[in-house]
């Protein structure tokens, strides 16, 4: 088998779909046991966060059109997978992620904000909002053909759901099952996949801007290999 054929995207990557189903199972199970059995959030939060963490692998693959050779399928699945992440549409995430690849460790890299460690990683959502809206203004695409940018509309709609939740008395469930897990999950993902691989964020060469993790997570020991395998699905 040639290298091109070996790594060519198949008609459909079923393993990625299985991971998507697994991630959604965690996330939806947390919603079910919370709403039906009133299980305390101390138990549902970890379940929701595990779901969000698991879903990141297929979300990442969708941004690179790696789930299917059909781009429409990638986009459709991406729009479904992004739902638990609350703060962003799939198109917004794709733009930010591809900007990271285009400008890794440079000033224009949206993930460079994570360089201060866990504290900055937990604030990544605010930074991403600033980065994305600033890019819309600079590209003069906030309004297109007389209509508000669809990604802005998506974000407004999500926050409108929060307002509706407040009015009908389910705001606590929305926060516990959707917003807080998304906030924590994104912070955790940022730390593991933004800060750790690129920490010190000084190298911009494509062969040196990513580094391995020393210590418990080092790839040179059996424990590290097992942990990395779990973290990266």
Model features per residue range: what roles?
Residues 1-54, 83-180:
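Non-catalytic, topology-defining segments of multipass membrane proteins
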Residues 37-42, 69-76, 170-172, 223-227:
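Membrane-helix interface segments
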Residues 49-59, 91, 182-205:
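Transmembrane alpha-helical segments that form the membrane-embedded catalytic/substrate-channel core
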Residues 57-64, 68, 100-101:
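Active-site recognition of the HExxH zinc-binding catalytic motif
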Residues 67-87, 108-120, 205-224:
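Juxtamembrane helix-capping/reentrant segments at transmembrane boundaries
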Residues 71-80, 98-103, 126-136, 201-212:
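Juxtamembrane/interfacial segments around transmembrane helices
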Residues 166-171, 179-180, 210-230:
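Cytosolic-facing loops and C-terminal tails of multi-pass membrane proteins
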Residues 198, 205, 227-233:
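Cytosolic/matrix-facing juxtamembrane and C-terminal tails of multi-pass cellular membrane proteins
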């Amino acid at each position: 088998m040639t290298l091109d054929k070996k790594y060519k995207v198949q008609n459909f990557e079923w393993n990625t779909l299985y991971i998507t189903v697994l991630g959604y199972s965690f996330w939806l199970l947390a919603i079910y046991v919370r709403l039906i059995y009133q299980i305390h959030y101390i138990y549902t939060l970890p379940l929701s966060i595990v779901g969000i963490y698991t879903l990141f692998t297929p979300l990442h693959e969708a941004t690179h059109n790696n789930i299917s050779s059909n781009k429409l399928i990638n986009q459709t699945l991406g729009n479904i997978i992004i739902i638990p992440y609350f703060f962003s549409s799939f198109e917004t995430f794709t733009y930010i992620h591809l900007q990271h690849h285009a400008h890794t460790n440079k000033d224009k890299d949206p993930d460079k904000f994570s360089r201060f460690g866990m504290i900055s990683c937990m604030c990544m959502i605010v930074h991403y909002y600033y980065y994305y809206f600033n890019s819309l203004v600079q590209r003069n695409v906030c309004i297109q053909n007389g209509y508000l940018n669809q990604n802005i509309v998506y974000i407004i709609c999500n926050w409108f759901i929060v307002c509706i939740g407040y009015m009908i008395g389910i705001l606590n469930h929305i926060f516990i099952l959707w917003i807080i897990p998304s906030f924590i999950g994104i912070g955790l993902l940022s730390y593991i996949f933004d800060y750790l691989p690129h920490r010190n964020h000084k190298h911009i060469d494509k062969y040196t801007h990513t580094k391995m993790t020393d210590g418990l997570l080092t790839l040179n020991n059996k424990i590290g290999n097992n942990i990395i395998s779990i973290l990266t699905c």
